[in-house]
């Protein structure tokens, strides 16, 4: 023990840094966690610029480091590429953001590594452990809030029709139907382009409809804030002329004026829960069914972007 302490002290004095390649060869573990970002672009921009993605990456990197691991980012939804990189570096486990259940099925045939999915809609809990958000309840809370403020024709705006978008619309639709008797998808759901310049052209065409409805529920804070920017250019006042809400409660929601009413999801809790589950999987623990598909609770955050309808 005394000799080991002397060697350690000498290594500290000379600033010795161990070679990771040699360590990988000499051990069965790499102490590397792969973070798969399942998309290269969001809203027509680099996905890492999205406030939700960047916040999650920051939170999960802290969790990985605190657990004594290193983080390797792997981008895209190419299952073969992910399997190749993971095997080459002997990655201990994967956290995968934004993949579909189908992609996880494909990866599982190629790779047997502990994996935790983030925000995947999973029909088979044995396929992959998932940590998601209670999207339905969050949008339901928003729908009730809109109804309580007297808005009968609130429009719901999204960029695609993936499972998450469908689930959020379903929650919104349930609340509006309970309040007013109906909420037809073909009348309320508007599909926007992911490209900003095209979205601006859509807004030009939709502006009369926006004014008539007086209320817009966006699928994300990003789209809501982007719309505020457009409205400012057009002389439209928020919330006096058109009220809006977002979803996610990213830090930008408090920076804009008016401050954005939105749904808060605890991204830090999502990251810590995912890492705790992954560590248990790495340690070969079998998780009970109720811990294989966790939904993080959400909360409506009321700020300044919605007025009471007279």
Locate each region found by the language model.
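N-terminal helix-turn-helix DNA-binding module of bacterial transcription factors
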Residues: 1-31, 307
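Short, solvent-exposed amphipathic alpha-helices that sit
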Residues: 48-66, 138-142, 163-183, 226, ...
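Hydrophobic alpha-helical segments within soluble ligand-binding/sensing domains
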Residues: 130-156, 197-204, 224, 265-284
